[in-house]
């Protein structure tokens, strides 16, 4: 029987590529989503991957969502915290709601989901948790104090939880994508996009499948000695 995996935000963009990669690895994948029901149904019809709707920023919804997945597929072995939102704006223009929504989903969602699966993983002596960070959590980004703070927090969360899980066979890692050719990036005005690409040493945007391959590595059975790490996939744009 294949491992059971949950991918939050798993039916679109980078999340879709991750769901498909884990499916290709033989896992039973549950793709979480929070928005468009029609697109979620289309995703399931096209891929055979079931979708489950809940808001990862809601603690109780995460508990209930995981219970539903486990009832359908079995205990969760792999968790990929990919769901994220943006509410961009400079600090001067940002209101508290725009700050809190991003923190609750992007960082709080990692806590909520890990809390829902960690004890079960620990009791079974196996788990893979991958938290999707961002290049903007590593280097910051103008107009994204909320997003950068949340994504930066993911890296600290990852390192701390990795220490808690290590002796129970649970690895916890982060993956920090650079600028990836998704619908979100495609919406950036062309002049701005040109400036972004000019700062990427490889000279192009990344592909969602390239991020998915990195996640697949971190979720693999034989990746048990990799924990507390951040894998940066950004075309060389940010090195440290």
Which positions does each model-derived feature cover?
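Active-site helix of classical SDR
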Residues: 114, 150, 158
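Substrate-binding pocket helix/loop in short-chain dehydrogenase/reductase
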Residues: 90-91, 98-103, 185, 196
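Residue(s) in the substrate-gating loop at a strand-loop-helix junction
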Residues: 134
């Amino acid at each position: 029987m294949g491992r059971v995996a949950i991918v939050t935000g798993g039916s679109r963009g980078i999340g879709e590529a991750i769901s498909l990669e884990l499916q290709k690895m033989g896992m039973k994948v549950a793709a979480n989503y929070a928005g468009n029901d029609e697109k979620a149904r289309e995703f399931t019809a096209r891929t055979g991957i079931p979708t489950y709707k809940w808001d990862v920023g809601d603690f109780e919804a995460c508990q209930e969502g995981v219970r539903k997945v486990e009832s359908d597929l079995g205990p969760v072995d792999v968790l990929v915290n990919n769901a994220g939102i943006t509410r961009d704006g400079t600090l001067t223009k940002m209101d508290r709601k725009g700050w809190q929504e991003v923190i609750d989903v992007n960082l709080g969602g990692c806590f909520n989901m890990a809390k829902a699966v960690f004890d079960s993983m620990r009791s079974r002596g196996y788990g893979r948790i991958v938290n999707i960070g961002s290049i903007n959590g590593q280097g910051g980004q103008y107009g994204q104090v909320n997003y950068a703070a949340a994504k930066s927090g993911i890296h600290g969360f990852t390192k701390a939880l990795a220490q808690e899980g290590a002796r129970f066979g649970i690895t916890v890692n982060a993956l920090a994508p650079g600028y990836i050719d998704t619908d979100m990036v495609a919406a950036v005005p062309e002049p701005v996009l040109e400036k972004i690409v000019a700062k990427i040493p490889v000279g192009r945007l990344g592909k969602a499948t390239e991020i998915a391959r990195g996640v697949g590595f971190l979720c693999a059975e034989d990746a048990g000695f990799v924990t507390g790490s951040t894998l940066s996939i950004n075309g060389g744009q940010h090195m440290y």
